[in-house]
Amino acid sequence: MALFHNLEPKRSIDFMSGARTSSGSPSVSYSNSLPSPHTALVAPLSKMQRALWFDYISAPESTMYNLTLKFKLDQESEEYDGSISAILRAIDFLTKRHGMLRSTFHNSSNPSQPPYFAEIDSRHAHPTTHIVSSSEQLKRAALRGFDLSVDGPIRWIVFTNVKSNELYAVAHHIAVDGSSMSQLSKEIITLLTHYKHQSAEMLAPTTTSNYGLYCLAQDSYTHQESYKKALHFWSSQIAGTLPMEWNSSMLRTNPARLTQTTSQLDHRVCSTWLSLTPQELKAWGNLYKTSWFRVATALIGLLCAKHSKHKFRTDQSLLVAFGARPEQSNDVLGHFANGMPIKIPISMLERSESAQLGGFVKEVSKNISAAKREEMFPYVDLVQHARRNGLNSEHRVSVTFSPKLASDICSLYPVEGVCDLFFCFLEEEDGGAILGLIYDPQLFTPDAIQTLREDFIQLIRFSLSPEDATQSLASFPGLSARQQFNGPPLHDVVAIDQCRVHALVQQQATLRPEQLALYSEELQMYMTYEELEMATNQAAHCLRACGSCKGEVVALHLSHGFDMIIWIYAAFKSGAAFTVVDPSYPPTRKSAIFELSKAKICVYDSKTAPSLQWAIDENLCSVFITTAGSDNTPIDRFPTHPLTDEGSTLDDLAYIIFTSGSTGLPKGVMVAHRQLSHFVSAARDCTPVGPSVRALQVLSFSFDAAVLEYAATLVYGGTLCFAEHRDALVGDYLADVVDANKINHLTATPSILATLPAAREMPTLRSICVGGEHCPEGVLNTWRQRVQLIHAYGPTETTVAVTLHRLPREIDPEEVADGVSPSSIMGKPLPNVKIYVCDTSRRILKNGKIGELHISGPQVSRGYIDREELNAEKFWINEHGERTYASGDRGRILPDGTVLLYGRINNREIKVRGYRLELGEIEKMITKADTQVRTVSVQANVTGDGLLAFVTPRTVDTEALRLALAKYAPRYMIPSEILAIDALPCTVNDKVDHARVQRDMADLRARASKLGTASLLTPNDTPLQSPSPPLSDISQLDLTDDLEWAAAKARIAEIWRQVLAAPGPILGGVKFFEAGGNSLLVLKLKAEIEGAFGVKVSFSDLFQNSTVDSQVGLVQSRRGSSGSPRTVRSHARPQRKAKTPPRQARPETPESDYDQLPDLRDDVQQSICSIWMEVLGYHGKLDAKSNFFELGGTSLQIPILHKALLREFPASNVSLVKVFQSATLAAQVELLGRFTESPRFSPRPAITPSAAVVSRSPRRPSSPAREQYAIVGMSGRFPGASTIPEFWDLLVHQRDGIQAIGGLEDAPLGPNEVLVQRRGLIKDVEHFDHEFWKMPKNYALRMDPQKRHFLNVALEALDDAGIELDPQGQNDVGIFVGSSENTFREYCATRSEDAFEMRHSHHMDTAVSATAAYYLNTFGPNVTLNTACSSALVALKLGMDALATGQTKVVCVGGCTIEYPLQGYITEPGKVLSTTGEVRPFDAASDGSVPGDAVCAVIIKRATDALADGDQIYAFVDGAAVGSDGHLDKPGITVPSPRGQAETIKRAMQQAHARPEQIAHVEVHGSGTRMGDALELEGLSIAYDQHLGRQAGQRPVSVGSNKGNFGNCEAASGLVSIIKAALSISNGVVPPLRKLETVGDHVDFMRLNLTPAREPLRLSRHDKVGVTSLGLGGSTAHVVLSAPPGNARRTKEWKQIRELHPTLLPCGPAN
């Protein structure tokens, strides 16, 4: 075409620059001078200005943000006056007209206030003007930075010449943007024209508005709902993007980014690329039906994609400048431009091989259109949000458009900026544009920039014609799609037929062996592709050894987890197919699956073994394999190399999925390997999964949609992630799992998706595939705006899905015909799949007609196993000769091939929560379960998430029916309501009229309610009542809480009844799911329980405690630990207020020769185990020695246990006392076994390979209910370290912070005394910025330095925690400080002028915490205490209690010790203070301690609050305890007691729910005294061995002390240890002791099973760390810490107040 023939630039773009140094110019610095006394207006900087401010103050001498406007003025012009006098006159007028040109910029003296600008009164404003006559003078004047606090933001330069003058307006970008410069050009031309002719319209002396009003309006905007909506949009623009990483071919050999502190400042180079005429720009825009700038932005995105790296299915973003100027500010000069990131959808290359340039441009244009509506949102706020949530906050390429200037005598020199590449379009006067590129020459060579230019010109020409607009993106050189896997092309049906999914996964193991294949953050487990390949090979060899081969079926009766994946692929590799037998199915359902599938091998695990025992007894399979392992045939004895392929055919079976069937038996759908391969191959363009993408396994493996999760994810090279509790994957728990595992993609049914809280950020989640049932339009609209939503449709019989429709973020009216609901749009068929609409005679209808959907193609399955008649009915050959499946779904096809779905044709087959159900099958099960039932009608309930059954006659016991039905039907097939009525409506043929039942459900329910129905009772149970067990023979049991227990039980039972819509009361032994519950109803149950009892429970809590009884215990324990005023007592014995009773001895267990349980498979054993688990709410491992009380049982639970045992073993009639005395499992089996005739299990030999899962760290045990606390901020001053980084560095490098100091030289010494002139000192201890705290100087001089320094470190710690205090509001922060005595008072040289205050200074001295609360403006509790060296840990415990009881939401815990006078000390050998001036804990040379000073603070929150707030966490505090030694085993008050200390450690460990083997390290008090160290370690060993039952042979616990580094910091010492422990957890390593040469004989580490920390100790994620602090006199404290979740770990850097305020006032005795 004629356009775009010559793209060479008509003129050059340049900017006023050399390097960013001003070679001959005076250096510029920011002086932060005060505003002029003639200031007329003060306003905070706008958010856009603040983003530039941070760059400015770091390098005020830089010219990177200088924006220059040039005028070339002819002095002889007839159009305007170009004289110097006219120029100066115009400058003066504009300075008075525009407040921004006469403003100065300043940092606030209050760090909580933003920087501001001060507008000088126009009467006192004087512009900065230079008149120069040489180029050198011009360069010196122009190439300088700004001192914005003095000079203002603009510098005028007049370059004189004979016939012309040049005017330069050099402005800082913080004050003006490109549109303001355009406005300024117009106003200067207007003024000069007016001065020439006195006829042009003169400008008004002031503007209609001012920039200050805009700043205030912007601040107001940040508090509006529209701001939150905009944040949501902008988050979507950076979600799923990564910073651009340039290809190495583009970069210099050693690219360097010079900082602005070097002598050669960072600078940029400008390259003018091309010119575009108005006609060319118009044609460009018309071709793509959008603006030319949007087309250009899209092409720049493609250009950058070609020359950069990016991960699979990730996008990139460009900063695009938006005007963001309000209409009322049109004539105001200021910085309105807002550069914001626009997503460039590079992932389109992977989403579709046929992705077209036109579609790509359209996506970018949509993003820009939406961005224009939200252009007011500040970029700096988005960056902060991105950093908090782990999103991309780094943008290296910018695109901008500067509108045309007033005349061709004007030129604009753009800013250089800080981007790697800055594409700048300047509008020409004729409407054309010039493109220039400003780039970083330290990164790119000129040749690389030339390559970019050539490629961009090629892209422009590539985009010219309509034919090119429809070309594939991949056809452009360098933009080929990144493939998930090396599978055949989609058109090669034969090649896909030959593929095998397990072979494709094997390809990934070859390509990326170290890539994560399987992962679980909760379980702390993962497997790489290489490890998965090896494990599946071993399991395949095992199957082959057991007889597995082609044609066989392996039944997988496994828990949801890694094992299921291993054995699925092992079955494939062995040549067999697999079928999943869900462990939750009833025996009759499992029996049907075993029988229909003809499985000869069954694989199970230890968790699922109990529910499979009957099948083993009945020999339902030839071979049973357990993953639990045995010494005979462990799986790791099998080879890791692949099996030899026995040869395969096209129709080899891959798996059998069982669905509901109308005959009363499940239907087994047989899917062959080639059908599975076709689905996985066809889904590649629609499923956003690939290398480095994390997908969550949400669905049950018995549900065919799970294939999309485990097959597609692993074939495409992604990472498949698992939750610990799959059944609980709804609501907040699902969101928690997404965040913890950093999930990018998940598959869910609409029922599950509807529970996912849309208010949660979930920053890593990029896409969701939803299907399995009808999805409400509201759910689609909610999530399509947040993520890429994929709407899936496909019957099980056609292999998972036949359409995968990617929904646009907003409904496009052009794409949706009138009257079409978005929820009915399923999209177009997958490649090689055909969908037809047929009438009842199976004639294919034209598009647009409604009928039954029929599906053909290579994904159509083999059919149903052993159901020939049904196969003939559902699978047929259509008129085109294609094998076709009749789906039973009603729909139509639009002209473009889009499939619309309108539901089922047969309303007796429905979908509930993703499961396809034949209602007739359930009705047959009901009649089989109870022969009294004459007629039955099962319907979907009103909400569509459950079933409702009506039965006749009204005398049917509905609860007995439900219990009987549980023997035949899976949980999801059991109606949540069964209502008995007198009659059901019938047809003329005397059959139940199900349509009328559906229509009249409300009336039938009302009739059933009037008639009444049976309650939810177990067969041997009685209705709920207050328990009243006989007490005559158990007087030793305290049952005073029974009435309260019964009240709580009755309340929870009523909640269940309401949630389940049950007709009668519910008893404690019924499980929630057996009573008709499901995972969706758990949401309602959770809300009701939390509302009724005022406690917080998690989804996993409710899944683990699934009966009324266990939930009562859960609620009781939560209320007991929460300190709530509405306390409901737990099972535990209430504390008596009278004399403390003696410890109750454990009842002795009668001797028994039954000392070992053979695999817990005996009926008696299994029954008792189940009862224990239900009563205790315990789900761990049980063995013969398991003790009821040691597992958490109490005397109050014995009557419950006794009652349950009598129900199970009614013939035994054992007394409650006997049960009480038989405390172990073995004893109760022995006690009750004699009353049971069932023989003990005698299993035949089974192959039992060991677990194949490779775990890098052991599984973390699931935590019982407990409160944890998070350390989210810290700061401190320590000997030898003034910041936290310095503190850590000193510890890591084992340096000594104790230093030499003078003093006491003239003090008299006793016979054995020595003067030691060493001490742990704080640097600059006497310096304090009183002005910063707005404190009178004289008052500050008298203030205890402990208070001064605590003010600073408390504020720094709060800042480190991201907590900004409101100086005008009520800050809900509590302050708890352990502090030493104020010794400064006596040495203070400055006295108060108030005589009364001087006389009573001891009484008038405010506490450290009170002083901090005043100056920090906090309103929470404040406490200062002194328990000697344990003070800070005691303060920590009080702070935790304040959080637990709701007194405050944030606590600042402090420790302070600064002792005056600052001098050495006098001591003598054998005393507590060292004669050598060195602290050496545990060393043979240790001789005491050395005094040390420290002031430090940590910020703690409740862990749940910290995680919800997105805080970065150093460590969790799991438990803490304080105690006293008493006097019974102490020779004196100053001697520590090991037993007193052990008691405190025990209580802290119990509160933390920690076991000794979990403790990797303990930071002990370790004062360096021989006796003190020995007694302390003795106490630690007593706690672990005698109180907590540490087993022999466990790893020795590491012990360390920081006293060798800092000395004994007295009241602060415990918090110093906490900070060290928290940093150790955060960094994953414990620093070693400073100095340990020879272990002293006073410490027997081997006997104590402890080890000194000689070397750095690596910590794993599950390791815990203890901290002990011992106060003189017997006040002891112990704390247990652990690691937070990986996504909450601390990553940000520390800031210190002294870095922000370096000018410090000396305050001390010397002054």
Curated annotation (Swiss-Prot):
Residues 506-907 are annotated as: Adenylation (A) domain. It holds the Pfam family Condensation. The active site is at residues 1429, 1565, 1608. Its EC number is 6.3.2.50. Residues 43-397 are annotated as: Condensation (C) domain. Keywords: Ligase, Multifunctional enzyme, Phosphopantetheine, Phosphoprotein, Transferase, Virulence. GO terms for biological process: amino acid activation for nonribosomal peptide biosynthetic process; enterobactin biosynthetic process; fatty acid biosynthetic process. Residues 1128-1140 have a biased composition (Basic residues). TAS1 has the following domain architecture: C-A-T-T-KS. The N-terminal NRPS module contains the condensation (C), adenylation (A), and thiolation (T) domains and catalyzes the formation of the amide linkage between the isoleucine (Ile) with acetoacetyl-CoA. The ketosynthase (KS) domain and this domain in the PKS portion of TAS1 is indispensable for TAS1 activity by conducting the final cyclization step for tenuazonic acid release. Hybrid PKS-NRPS synthetase that mediates the biosynthesis of the toxin tenuazonic acid (TeA), an inhibitor of protein biosynthesis on ribosomes by suppressing the release of new protein. TAS1 alone is sufficient for TeA synthesis via the condensation of isoleucine (Ile) with acetoacetyl-CoA by the N-terminal NRPS module and subsequent cyclization conducted by the C-terminal KS domain. This is Hybrid PKS-NRPS synthetase TAS1. The gene is TAS1.
